[in-house]
Amino acid sequence: MKIRNSLKSAKVRDKDCRVVRRHGKVYVINKKNPRMKARQG
């Protein structure tokens, strides 16, 4: 999982990427390609 300042670039890397909020943190998840996971921080 990558830790990024901005998730905009992480979101557009793949069309299956989703932005979700969990426990006050923002994540990009991708069920089809888990290598695309990222967290904002």
Swiss-Prot record:
Q: Name one GO biological process term.
A: translation
Q: Does the keyword Transit peptide apply?
A: no
Q: What cellular component GO annotations does this protein have?
A: ribonucleoprotein complex; ribosome
Which GO molecular-function terms appear in the entry? structural constituent of ribosome
**What InterPro entries does the database record attribute to this sequence?**
Ribosomal_bL36, Ribosomal_bL36_sp, Ribosomal_L36_bact
- Name residues in a coiled coil: none
Q: Which UniProt keywords apply?
A: Ribonucleoprotein, Ribosomal protein
Family listed: Belongs to the bacterial ribosomal protein bL36 family.
HAMAP family annotated for this entry? Ribosomal_bL36
Q: What is this protein called?
A: Large ribosomal subunit protein bL36
Organism equals Gluconacetobacter diazotrophicus (strain ATCC 49037 / DSM 5601 / CCUG 37298 / CIP 103539 / LMG 7603 / PAl5)
